[in-house]
Amino acid sequence: MGVDSGCVGIVGLGLIGGSIGLDLRAQGIKVQGLVHRSSTAERAMERGLVSAVSTDPACLACCDLVILALPIPALLKPNAEFLEALPAEAVVTDVGSVKQPVLQEWKGRHPRFVASHPMAGTAQAGVEAGQRDLFQGRPWIATPDAKTDSAALAVVEDLARRLGSRWFTAAAAQHDQAVALISHMPVLVSAALLRAAGDERDPEIRALAQALASSGFADTSRVGGGNPDLGLAMASSNREAVLKALAAYRWSLEQLE
């Protein structure tokens, strides 16, 4: 079974969920959205993110693939009504940036769950953020374990390749250590840079720095100025690997001194 053989459900229509919906619909695939608020549902339809949308989890009954485009805290504490609505025969995958706790939570909750993570994004969020071709040429990694359904894994690979992504698999622990280095730590370091510049005690120097800041500072600090809740969730859910990465970065700074 491939992605084009039935209906794809997307839970959450922010940047990642909305972008997946746009790309799948462009391929003629039926997309069923599930969101919390009716206002979000209305805007999702206006933007063409989905074929149909609802605030009722029962809408997922028709879906052969369900994509959990949810924040990490929501993935780790799924709603009971939502869990009951997931079809047992459907393939279920997530898009969270931390894999060990998500895999641990979900592998016992659904027999066809595949932990995955598309490595793509922008600084935008919410129902207005979805865009075409977000995943083109970007990595998409799955972290199966010994009990992961191989046919379900193949469906998620088909999804990733349809969206133009480069497909990878790794152990969940390896994924979390790698993204701590190249994704999670940069967010924290960038936020620290913004704070250091903003906390300059001399008001004249601080004002001059703000006036002179240009593309170099913008590029270096961009990821640190994003959604603070997202950064906190990434760091707290991947704490051990992030601390290890920060220790390595601290050592590098000490060598510069």
Task: Report residues per predicted region.
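Short, structured coil segments at secondary-structure junctions
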Residues: 47-49, 109, 136, 163
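Rossmann-like NAD(P)-binding element
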Residues: 57-86, 90-93
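Phosphate-coordination loops involved in phosphoryl transfer and adenosine-cofactor binding
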Residues: 4-7, 89, 137
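Rossmann-like NAD(P)(H) cofactor-binding subdomain of soluble oxidoreductases
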Residues: 78-128
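NAD(P)+-binding Rossmann beta1-loop-alpha1 motif at the extreme N-terminus of oxidoreductases
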Residues: 1-57, 61, 65
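Glycine-rich, N-terminal phosphate-binding loop of Rossmann-like dinucleotide-binding domains
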Residues: 69-71, 96, 144, 192
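Internal alpha-helical scaffold of NAD(P)-dependent oxidoreductase catalytic cores
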Residues: 134-223
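Interdomain hinge/lid region at the active-site interface
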Residues: 205-257
